[in-house]
Curated annotation (Swiss-Prot):
Belongs to the sodium:solute symporter (SSF) (TC 2.A.21) family. It comes from Mus musculus. It is a multi-pass membrane protein. GO terms for molecular function: symporter activity. This is Sodium/glucose cotransporter 4. GO terms for biological process: sodium ion transport.
Amino acid sequence: MNTELVAMEPGVSRNGVRTETTTNPSLGLHTYDIVVVVIYFVFVLAVGIWSSIRASRGTVGGYFLAGRSMTWWPIGASLMSSNVGSGLFIGLAGTGAAGGLAVGGFEWNATFLLLALGWIFVPVYIAAGVVTMPQYLKKRFGGQRIQVYMSVLSLILYIFTKISTDIFSGALFIQMALGWNLYLSTVILLVVTAVYTIAGGLTAVIYTDALQTVIMVGGALVLMFLGFQEVGWYPGLQQLYRQAIPNTTVPNTTCHLPRPDAFHMLRDPVNGDIPWPGLIFGLTVLATWCWCTDQVIVQRSLAAKNLSHAKGGSVLGGYLKILPMFFIVMPGMISRALYPDEVACVDPDICQRVCGARVGCSNIAYPKLVMALMPVGLRGLMIAVIMAALMSSLTSIFNSSSTLFAIDVWQRFRRQASEQELMVVGRLFVVFLVVISILWIPIIQSSNSGQLFDYIQSITSYLAPPITALFLLAIFCKRVNEPGAFWGLMFGLVVGILRMILEFSYSAPACGEMDRRPAVLKDFHYLYFALLLCGLTAIIIVVISFFTEPIPDDKLARLTWWTRNCAVSDLQKKTSVSVNNTEDDNSPGLAGRPVVEGPAGDEEEANTTQGPEQPGALHRSWGKWLWNWFCGLSGAPQQALSPAEKAVLEQKLTSIEEEPLWRRVCNINAIILLAINIFLWGYFA
């Protein structure tokens, strides 16, 4: 459908809805808004300090796995808030404004994988007795090259994708809503976030995540109801969204028109912007990596008291992941329906004036709706919501990155590192991440805001599928060995990088430009590519494994789905010890200390290291005392457990037994959750 350049009366769109034409309105915060934001920060710091004081922070397990003491509800809330960062509020609402409901499938797909995490992956991880995902691969396959590759790859992804996305999105909202200085506001957020992450470890992170989840869901639901009230609820949204055309368009193009399939989840497999086979199958590959093998997510479930609490956390997280479709995607569509001249702009000059990006301004959909619809006081609440999303995701990344660095990287260089050294190194690495995050701000500012989220998605589709294939085969196929796993990963990495080079060599065309990209890019969706890459990597892993020597069955005890319930006999213990002692890449920082092997750090263990103050302790300076508390260092000497005590503790920490009642409760709730999710897919398909 061709249109001509149209200039209508300012402030009136084609659908007759009044729109605001000011690009950067100077909206001063009311006193009530400021009070709400201050109360939010006070609550977060109070919860962080409270959880830091009560936490077991002086051991690897206490700091990195919350002492294996978390119950189901903070785990479920933390799973939600760790994933729903400020980037999701900005990016998901923006994609919904541009393309409709289909992007909500990314959230609903997570429900299935969260249940897979609790019922399939976590039992194996707990039985294996691991703290990090690279550590599991090392136990499963032996050798060190896979562990080091996975650790470094994860850290690179965290620093240059997750952290940068969240900071960019939070900065975009703060700039538009508050007019604060970008650097000052971001530095304050990062410093407050880092302080309770460093001080309290995973316990502080999970409890503050739980608080922020309540704030996020509550504030977002308020905005959702106000938005639906403004457009006439769902029927009104359907009508107004289809008419949401900006006043100024590019001649002879259809870029400005809303998609005709905007209210359908399942779209054409060839011409759809999110084809349905890719949404169901290709996305599952990426989601498996995100929810079942990514350290940020899995670490929360590994902190559970027992397997039933881990399953309960997955169920709660699955229910919470149903909500973003309604309080993020649909408000994004409402924003386009109400303010098409800004949110749906297509003329590059107008877009540059509105949001500073010539390719489009869909990213401002959510903050635009907040500033236009929320009344005094509630506007401050929504600012707190975005800050909560930003800080909760950053704390998760900081804590998980410090875990990976201390356990999987630092111990490669310091094989005899003491437990206290690991605690200090993990905390100092968080400081390093904060510095990198601040230095990354100018790069984010100069980046094209319209391409940043495409960049994040493409990075995932290029690098995640081989990891998904490896973990699935590691857990379900005992025949897979280390050579097959390593060379399969290398093959997947090379193919993914080749696609990445093509992607960034040929940028997507702007509205009105001819698409000159090769067919492998413009006609082969990245979700299809993810599915293909996962399949090819799996084939390479299996073929090489079958042509090389298999791993003996006695070395796979409690490391696969089929051997997760194997009793830890004396023979298996000796085998495990001999493997660790003969491997060149042994990690004495974990295995060499009796209380830290596997998911170390139970509350009982913490008590053995938190002894009474020494007689000379009263003469220590307050500064030294504060430093020792901050770093989780105890003045008392560590007490080594006897072999019998160690065996009892290790058996407790690696137990996947469940009480029959709670196992049935979890199973019933999982079935109900699946039924609700499948109904929603069918209703919006």
